[in-house]
Amino acid sequence: MSAIERITKAAHLIDMNDIIREGNPTLRAIAEEVTFPLSDQEIILGEKMMQFLKHSQDPVMAEKMGLRGGVGLAAPQLDISKRIIAVLVPNIVEEGETPQEAYDLEAIMYNPKIVSHSVQDAALGEGEGCLSVDRNVPGYVVRHARVTVDYFDKDGEKHRIKLKGYNSIVVQHEIDHINGIMFYDRINEKDPFAVKDGLLILE
């Protein structure tokens, strides 16, 4: 049974056992574009990927299922070489405040593509992690500070979004996965915390 057949079964909930780890060649492959109309499997896969992210951010479900918290997941991480990503960034509010929306960014993207980006680069001050990487890899992961991304939804409708800050970093991380790139490829090997002129450090 293929990975997509297993994962899209009605009763299946994606867990850490479904996520392949660094060293698996699927993580280094250029994933294939999906064609429209999507298959039922491709639609269900996107929904299951989003469901996994919601479970991973729910303390009760995460503990019950043994999940690491995640804000993004790409199909290649499930050993499915297709250009599908899911991103779920919660709204962070001051203690005691209620957010207007639960999520700052919530999207299942088919064939996402960066169509333009800022000259300025940015990196997360605390570095990046990945559900497919079980070790800590310190260093600044240098990315574009701002990006414009085109993608399609499950109905084949095209969307264009402009992203900055943390949301921009998350989406770039996931688009890297469908291009066979791991986050640590973007860390300066000789000097992991090197700061070149103009690099924006996001705390």
Swiss-Prot record:
One of its GO terms (biological process) is translation. Its EC number is 3.5.1.88. The active site is at residue 174. It catalyses: N-terminal N-formyl-L-methionyl-[peptide] + H2O = N-terminal L-methionyl-[peptide] + formate. One of its GO terms (molecular function) is peptide deformylase activity. Binds 1 Fe(2+) ion. Keywords: Hydrolase, Iron, Metal-binding, Protein biosynthesis. Fe cation binds at residues 130, 173, 177. Gene3D superfamilies: Peptide deformylase (3.90.45.10). Its cofactor is Fe(2+). NCBIfam families: pept_deformyl (TIGR00079). Belongs to the polypeptide deformylase family. Removes the formyl group from the N-terminal Met of newly synthesized proteins. Requires at least a dipeptide for an efficient rate of reaction. N-terminal L-methionine is a prerequisite for activity but the enzyme has broad specificity at other positions. This is Peptide deformylase.
